[in-house]
């Protein structure tokens, strides 16, 4: 795998250079990361069959990065689980899905996963176990490394059936994305050694942007721990101490930072590049960033988890940001072709909106253990005389005359909120499982062209015993046991019934038009 070879070369030539640094103080150099992942990979190879998923559990811990690399070296896909944002029942659901032929899944746990209730049987390596294995040393056989169509990682995303679905990204997808990622980094004005901001949870595919780019280029991941991100003052101090040169985040995170007047070039004098992905970049956010960071450039990108993070990019100029038109998300990367199709799957003319179809060498293998779902949205094609996979995104977009993609939103029940992809059907399914709920639907509320919050429309199964406000609070507390925080509706509206259309279907448009 080229990605591992890149890191190996850096570890050999610049072994004492920091590879991962966390805002709370922990740090590992390249030689420490390489040696530790070698030793852990040897253990995994001796105890886990090649190709069997291994869970890596924690939050912004350097040993999670060690775990990712160790899995790749051992020939096993890693499954990242953020211990802060992913609730217990969701962890249990993911664990059940990756259980291999009745065996207990191996978990590399940098935090205590034994506190998670309702978990199936696990083989857990605690932090103490991991340290013991690393101290013992060792390395796997080189032929255990993943390559080609081997699965590199599995990211579980929102699923409409009420259970998360695992997106399988191959080693070749990862390598192809990484090569493009390194090209994008050149916008920062240097070849390597840059410090990359690592803010998104590792269970969110945006984090692969910096995992790939930083380590393959000899740079450093500067990880913002949960404890840092929950305090505005601590976060500002951490950013000031980071010396970050390449910023990777959702636009929403940057927008939160912009609320502080101190967030400007003087705070981050080395910052030269903003890379945004995961949701729509508002013109005002781009404009304010370019004003406050005159030495930095802004890249807007687009891509679902199923196409390895991102497949398009474009630089946003001050003139574009100051305009009234929504910002484009750019042209496709090498090895990728975009099509816009109508409801019948026929190509749309330039300037016409339709469904975005991605064809290329970073399209995922499919959904883990779900051939039924895979066959619905994945296919095959040929790009640059090479056979590739295709993915129907469910996104609405348009290609202009210059080949630039313009993204307008989701065609189905999927929405993006603060950069997180959410399947409204999954929230509805969890609501319906509650005994106090007879029927439920979830809609997204919009403000200034993007999703501001979620609204749950609930038909109660019994008369309300408290005020609607207090009943709504209790309902949201119940949901927190099964859903991540970003999927919890902000508002709960109790109704006698849900509106229907003339053909007997739920009138989602009517619900969405309700003011909340």
Segments the model singles out, each with a brief description of its role:
Residues 21-24, 275-277, 418:
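Glycine-rich Rossmann NAD(P)(H)-binding loop
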Residues 58-62, 204, 489:
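Substrate-binding/gating loop at the entrance of the active-site cleft, primarily
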Residues 1-154, 169, 176, 282-286, ...:
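AMP-binding/adenylate-forming domain of the ANL superfamily
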Residues 14, 260, 293, 371, ...:
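Acidic-histidine catalytic/liganding microenvironments
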Residues 2-4, 100-144, 174, 297-300, ...:
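AMP-dependent adenylate-forming
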Residues 63, 68, 76-95, 137-347, ...:
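Motif- and composition-driven signal specific to adenylation
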Residues 54, 107-108, 196, 247, ...:
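Receiver (REC) domain switch-region micro-motif
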Residues 50, 103, 243, 267-270, ...:
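Short loop/turn motifs at secondary-structure junctions
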């Amino acid at each position: 795998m080229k990605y591992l070879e890149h890191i190996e070369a850096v570890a050999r030539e610049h072994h004492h250079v920091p590879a991962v640094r966390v805002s709370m103080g922990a740090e590992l150099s390249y030689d420490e990361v390489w040696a530790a992942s070698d030793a852990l990979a040897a253990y995994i190879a001796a105890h886990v069959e090649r190709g069997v998923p291994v869970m890596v559990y924690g939050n912004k811990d350097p040993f999670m990065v060690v775990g990712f690399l160790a899995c790749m070296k051992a020939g096993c896909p890693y499954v990242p689980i953020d211990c802060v944002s992913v609730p217990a029942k969701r962890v249990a659901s993911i664990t059940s899905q990756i259980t291999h032929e009745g065996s207990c899944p191996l978990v590399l746990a940098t935090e205590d996963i034994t506190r998670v209730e309702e978990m199936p049987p696990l083989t857990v390596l605690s932090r103490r176990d991991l340290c013991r294995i690393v101290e013992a040393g060792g390395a796997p056989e080189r032929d255990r490394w993943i390559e080609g169509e081997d699965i590199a990682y599995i990211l579980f995303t929102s699923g409409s059936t009420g259970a998360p679905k695992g997106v399988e990204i191959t080693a070749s997808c990862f390598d192809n994305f990484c090569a493009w990622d390194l090209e994008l980094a050149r916008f920062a004005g240097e070849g390597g050694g840059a410090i990359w901001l690592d803010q998104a949870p590792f269970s969110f595919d945006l984090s692969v942007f910096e995992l790939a780019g930083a380590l393959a280029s000899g740079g450093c991941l500067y990880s913002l721990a949960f404890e840092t991100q929950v305090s505005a003052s601590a976060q500002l101090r951490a950013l000031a101490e980071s010396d970050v040169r390449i910023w990777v985040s959702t636009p929403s995170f940057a927008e939160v930072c912009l609320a502080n007047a101190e967030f400007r070039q003087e705070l981050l004098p080395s910052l030269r590049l903003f890379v945004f992905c995961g949701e729509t970049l508002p013109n005002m956010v781009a404009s304010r960033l370019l004003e406050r960071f005159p030495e930095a450039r802004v890249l807007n990108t687009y891509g679902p988890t199923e196409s390895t993070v991102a497949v398009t990019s474009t630089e946003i100029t001050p003139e574009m940001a100051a305009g009234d038109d929504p910002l484009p998300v750019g042209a496709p990367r090498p090895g990728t072709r975009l099509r816009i199709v109508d409801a019948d799957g026929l190509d749309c003319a330039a300037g016409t909106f339709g469904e975005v179809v991605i064809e290329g060498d970073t399209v995922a293998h499919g959904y883990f253990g779900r051939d039924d779902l895979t066959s619905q949205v994945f296919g095959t094609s040929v790009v640059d005389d090479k056979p590739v996979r295709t993915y129907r995104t469910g996104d609405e977009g348009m290609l202009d005359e210059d080949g630039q993609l313009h993204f307008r939103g989701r065609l189905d029940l999927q929405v993006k909120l603060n950069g997180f992809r959410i399947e409204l059907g999954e929230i509805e399914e969890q609501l319906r499982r509650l005994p106090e709920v007879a029927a439920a639907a979830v809609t997204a509320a919009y403000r200034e062209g993007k999703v501001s919050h979620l609204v749950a429309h609930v038909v109660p199964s019994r008369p309300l015993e408290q005020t609607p406000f207090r009943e709504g609070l209790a309902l949201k507390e119940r949901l927190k046991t099964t859903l991540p925080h970003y999927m919890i509706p902000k508002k709960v509206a109790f109704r006698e019934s849900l509106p229907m259309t003339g053909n007997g279907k739920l009138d989602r448009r009517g619900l969405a038009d309700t003011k909340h």
